[in-house]
Amino acid sequence: MEINTHNAEILLSAANKSHYPQDDIPEIALAGRSNVGKSSFINTLLNRKNLARTSGKPGKTQLLNFFNIDDKLRFVDVPGYGYARVSKKEREKWGRMIEEYLTSRENLRAVVSLVDLRHDPSADDVQMYEFLKYYDIPVILVATKADKIPRGKWNKHESAIKKKLDFDKNDDFILFSSVTKDGLDAAWDAILSKI
């Protein structure tokens, strides 16, 4: 499938399924801890500076943000999890919103689960991966911020992440940097193979 990534726009933000777009365009959701680099990942894939707003303030995305890409594909930016400065009630609300989308959305083809290559996955990262595996949702695991680690240490960090997640070798694992564009083609290949 040919996709013109320049033809991309934010379509809408939704709090529940009554607000989701009503059509059959395939969707790829993006999930990860606050400040893992989701917005930078989206902007890099779409070759845009700030289509997805990057923020120094974690926990900025509080709704599901739907990005229309060439009327052929949508990215769905899921609120970042694991941010402590949000009330427990607010976190539970986000949790329900995310769970509703991931378990009931027929358009969903796969989830790009983002983790920070520099650190072991958090308990929230592990829980998200287990959740996706439990519901049999295809996963593309993207380890971000690869430029912050010397290339010679990538394998060591990759192995540590896979071990902590009990990673399924049938899932895609991509080392990614929005700075150097490492992993850009691999990410698109993985996404397009799912739709």
From Swiss-Prot:
Cofactor(s) required for function per UniProt: Mg(2+)
Pfam families given in the database record: MMR_HSR1 (PF01926)
Residues annotated as binding Mg(2+): 39, 61
Record-listed GTP binding positions: 32-39, 59-63, 77-80, 144-147, 176-178
InterPro entries for this protein: G_ENGB_dom, GTP-bd, GTP-bd_ribosome_bio_YsxC, P-loop_NTPase, Small_GTP-bd
MF-aspect GO terms: GTP binding; metal ion binding
CDD domains according to UniProt: YihA_EngB
Gene3D superfamilies in the cross-refs: P-loop containing nucleotide triphosphate hydrolases
Similarity remark: Belongs to the TRAFAC class TrmE-Era-EngA-EngB-Septin-like GTPase superfamily. EngB GTPase family.
UniProt name for this protein: Probable GTP-binding protein EngB
Taxonomy of the source species: Bacteria, Bacillati, Bacillota, Bacilli, Lactobacillales
Gene: engB
